[in-house]
Amino acid sequence: MTSQLRKINNVIEQFLLPLAEAVSGWSTLAAIRSALIVTLPLMFLGSLAELLISFPLDAYKEFMFRQFGPEWRMFGQILKDATFSVMSLIMVFSIGHHLADQFNHDNPVLRANPVIAGLVAFTAFFCLLQQDGDALNRRWLGVAGLFVAILVGVFATRLFLYFFSIKRLHLHLPGGTPDIAIPQAFNAFIPGMLTVLVFAALGAAMQTFVGMSLHEALYQSIRMPFDAIGEGLGRGMLYILSLHVLWFAGIHGANVLDPITHDIYGAAMLANEVAAAAGEPLPHIMTKTFMDTFVFMGG
């Protein structure tokens, strides 16, 4: 037994640890990881809000109703809407900011304003959202849009920094200015415009030629292997494997795969509830409740 454990440790030290170090040292993944970490205070606040409005105890709900009236959930819902419901927006800005910080560390002479980089990525993300009449589809502003937010945050910021590194695209002001933000803004003027124009063209092309937003297209592509496998152990194993591969790369797998969780396992849970209410056999084994109880034990 000891020799087997020693062999396993040798394999981990020789192959897995160098791979993990290489992955953790990749600048893009490091920026994504840091961007997630700095959002933890807001995510913790959103978690408290979710607990406040969804605590599964009737005595608690009755107490809150007596103390604060029928609108007692409003406070928690406002907090949730300001955190979880806009997580993709927070994330895309945070990624842009951290990638610009890395760029400035590697290019101390040619410095880009991290806030401007974050705002450019933020705007690029909006260019890809599908419009519902005069309103935007809010589904992709929250956790469901996190995967696209990560992609847009990386590619939009990388594109902006590429344009920014071309000094001919900088607008130089004559003389000195008392506020350093002014030359930084003018230097980023053309690179920022070009980046947003590229993503606006991509958003328009997706709507015109594909008939759906990039969010929908990527989600359908991610869902295809899950649908192809069919319901059962294979789909569950693929879901868990995908989730932990994302975690291995430093990305919050549960949040990225939230659309799969909601549309497949959440729908299966609702179908079981309908069948149970009708006195029929439950049609699904693997549901969101099954995953939370038997796979993700401990919450």
Regions found by a protein language model. Name each.
Residues 2-43, 49, 65-68, 72-252:
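Signature of multi-pass transmembrane helix bundles
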Residues 50-54:
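Active-site beta-loop-alpha substructure in enzyme catalytic cores
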Residues 257-258:
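Carboxylate/His-rich catalytic cores and anion/metal-binding grooves
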Residues 261, 265-299:
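Helix-loop-helix junctions within the multi-pass membrane cores of secondary transporters/permeases
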